[in-house]
C-alpha cells in the first residue's frame, strides 16, 4: 500500500517497549479496598480480569453474555472489570449485570492506576475487543504469566501467538469463546503453560531497552 502511494523508503516497524522492572514494582501496590473486599467475598473463585476503557468496541456486553451462560452451566468465577468510561455506558452495563442476576459475580472497579496489581490476582485476562491496535494489556498480563484469551484482530497477533503463548479467537464468535473458556476451566494447566512461554517471549521482544536501542540504531543509519 505504501509503495502504491509512492513511498519507496524502507519502513521498519519498532514495537512499543515496556519497563518490566517498573511494572513489577507497581504490582506491589495495593488494590482499592472495594476490590479487595469483593475478592475476599469471592475467595476460591477464578478471577477473570478485563482491563480497558468502557467502550462499546471493547466487548463487555459480549463477555457478560458468555459468562452468564457459563454460570447457568454451573461454572463459578468472578469477573473483575477494570477501566473507566462514560457514566451512561457504565450505568447501562451495571443494569445488565443486575438484570441477569450477576451482581455477585461481576465487579466494575472503574479506573485502577497502576493496573499492575490486577495481574497479581487474575487467573485469566480476556480481551474480547472488536477493534484493537496493539493490545498492551495482553503484554502486561503475559509479563506476570497470566493466561490470556483475546480476539484475533488488529495488532493483537503481533503480541500473542495463537495456541503458543495464548488463545486468539474470532471477534464475536460466541461458540469459539464458550469453548475456549470451558477449556480453561477444564484444563487450566495448559493455559498456564502457554502463559509461562508468553512471559519469556514478551520480555524478550518488548523490553524497553531493546526498543530504545533499535530506534537509536535506525536513527544512526538514517
Label the predicted regions.
Residues 1-13, 18-22:
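A short, active-site helix/loop in glycosyltransferases that binds the activated sugar's phosphate group
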Residues 24-41:
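A short helix/loop element that forms part of the nucleotide-sugar donor recognition site in Leloir-type
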Residues 46, 176, 183, 190-205, ...:
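A short, well-ordered alpha-helix in the C-terminal region of glycosyltransferases
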Residues 46, 50-69, 91-92, 167, ...:
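A conserved mid-protein helix/loop that constitutes part of the nucleotide-sugar donor-binding site
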Residues 92-110:
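Nucleotide-activated donor-binding/catalytic signature segment of Leloir-type glycosyltransferases, i.e.
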Residues 111, 130:
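Aromatic "clamp/platform" in nucleotide-sugar-dependent glycosyltransferases that forms part
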Residues 147-150, 160:
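Short hydrophobic beta-strand element within catalytic cores of glycosyltransferases
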Residues 162-163, 167-174, 183-189:
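Conserved acidic donor-binding segment of nucleotide-sugar-dependent glycosyltransferases
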Amino acid at each position: 500500500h505504501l509503495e502504491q502511494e509512492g513511498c519507496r523508503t524502507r519502513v521498519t516497524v519498532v514495537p512499543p517497549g515496556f519497563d518490566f522492572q517498573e511494572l513489577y514494582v507497581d504490582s506491589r501496590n495495593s488494590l482499592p479496598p472495594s476490590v479487595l473486599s469483593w475478592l475476599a467475598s469471592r475467595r476460591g473463585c477464578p478471577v477473570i480480569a478485563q482491563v480497558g476503557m468502557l467502550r462499546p468496541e471493547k466487548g463487555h456486553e459480549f463477555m457478560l453474555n458468555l459468562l452468564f451462560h457459563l454460570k447457568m452451566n454451573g461454572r463459578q468465577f468472578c469477573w473483575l472489570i477494570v477501566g473507566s468510561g462514560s457514566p451512561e455506558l457504565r450505568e447501562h452495563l451495571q443494569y445488565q449485570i443486575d438484570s441477569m442476576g450477576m451482581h455477585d459475580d461481576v465487579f466494575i472497579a472503574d479506573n485502577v492506576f497502576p493496573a499492575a496489581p490486577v495481574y497479581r490476582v487474575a487467573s485469566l485476562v480476556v480481551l474480547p475487543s472488536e477493534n484493537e491496535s496493539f493490545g498492551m494489556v495482553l503484554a502486561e498480563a503475559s509479563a506476570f504469566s497470566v493466561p490470556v484469551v483475546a480476539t484475533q484482530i488488529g495488532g493483537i497477533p503481533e503480541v500473542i501467538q495463537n495456541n503458543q503463548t495464548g488463545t486468539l479467537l474470532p471477534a464475536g464468535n460466541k461458540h469459539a469463546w464458550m469453548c475456549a473458556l470451558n477449556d480453561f476451566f477444564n484444563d487450566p494447566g495448559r493455559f498456564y503453560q502457554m502463559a509461562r512461554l508468553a512471559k519469556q517471549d514478551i520480555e524478550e521482544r518488548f523490553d524497553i531497552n531493546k526498543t530504545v536501542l533499535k530506534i537509536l540504531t535506525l536513527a544512526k543509519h538514517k
